C-alpha cells in the first residue's frame, strides 16, 4: 500500500489508472483494518478474565491500533533511511532526512515503550481492554449511498 500511495500522488497519473489504484488502496485499507480488529479480538479474549482495579482507566486506542501505528512508523523509518543515504540526492536533502530519521527512531522507541506499558497495565487491571471499532463505511454496500443506490437501479 505504501507504494500505491506514492503512485497515486503522481500528477501525471491517468484518471483510469488512478481509479484502479484508489480501489486497491481502499481494499488494502479494509484488509488492514480487518487484521487489526482481529488482533484486538485476540487481546479481548486474552484479557477477559482480568479483574479491574477500582481506578482502572481507558486508553485512547487499543493495543492493535497502536501496533498498527508502529508498523506505519517502521515503514517511514525504512524509507527515510533510504532517502538519507540516497547518493543522487543533495547533501542538504540527505542531512534533513538524517535529522528526521533521528526523530522517527525516537518516536519508535517511545511508541514501543507505550505499547509495552499499555499491555502490562491491561494485564494488571490498571487499564480497561476496550476496542473502538472503525466502522468503515466506504466499502459496505449497505452503508455507502452510491453503492446501495446503484444496487437498487
Please provide the spans of the model-predicted regions.
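Anionic, Ser/Thr-rich low-complexity intrinsically disordered regions
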Residues: 1-153
Amino acid at each position: 500500500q505504501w507504494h500505491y500511495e506514492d503512485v497515486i500522488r503522481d500528477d501525471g497519473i491517468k484518471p483510469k489508472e488512478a481509479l484502479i489504484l484508489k480501489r486497491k488502496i481502499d481494499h488494502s485499507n479494509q484488509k488492514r483494518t480487518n487484521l487489526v480488529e482481529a488482533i484486538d479480538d485476540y487481546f479481548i479474549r486474552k484479557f477477559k478474565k482480568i479483574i479491574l482495579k477500582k481506578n482502572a482507566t481507558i486508553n485512547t486506542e487499543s493495543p492493535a491500533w497502536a501496533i498498527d501505528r508502529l508498523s506505519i512508523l517502521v515503514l517511514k523509518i525504512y524509507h527515510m533511511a533510504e532517502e538519507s543515504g540516497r547518493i543522487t540526492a543533495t547533501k542538504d536533502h540527505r542531512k534533513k532526512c538524517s535529522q528526521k530519521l533521528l526523530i522517527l527512531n525516537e518516536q519508535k522507541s517511545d511508541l514501543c515503550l507505550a505499547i509495552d506499558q499499555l499491555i502490562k497495565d491491561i494485564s494488571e487491571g490498571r487499564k480497561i481492554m476496550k476496542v473502538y471499532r472503525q466502522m468503515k463505511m466506504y466499502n459496505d454496500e449497505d452503508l455507502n449511498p452510491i453503492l446501495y443506490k446503484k444496487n437498487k437501479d
